[in-house]
Amino acid sequence: MTERTESQKSGLSTRIISSVSGFLEAIVTLLPADAGGRIGPIAPRDGNYCPALRRALPDAPSIPIRFIEGPPWIAPGQDGRVVVEIEDGALDCAGFASGVELELVEGKRVVGILTVLRLWREAMVG
């Protein structure tokens, strides 16, 4: 019998973003569990919470992200200031401007809202 990891139990996959093209500083607001949000809190500083972002439009593409900084815990129904990594190539199609609100999704379920405060583009070193 194999032991399941916490990410397998929750239905989330932990993925490594191999090529990062930018970072977002943002306010994330998690929906309460009774409004369809997560049951448990997230730990932004751990670097293993990897949901996706998308615009609130029909058929909008999902953009993989990874939380890398923020408060120790953010529980459902709470908010916090965070920094997330954005997968390479997603910056060109997303239009991350200050004040833009994006859905935070796990699979197909919306679990929160992310409000962009600032975008940093990674410098290429060669």
Model-predicted segments: where are they?
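C-terminal effector/interaction modules appended to NTPase cores
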Residues: 2-126
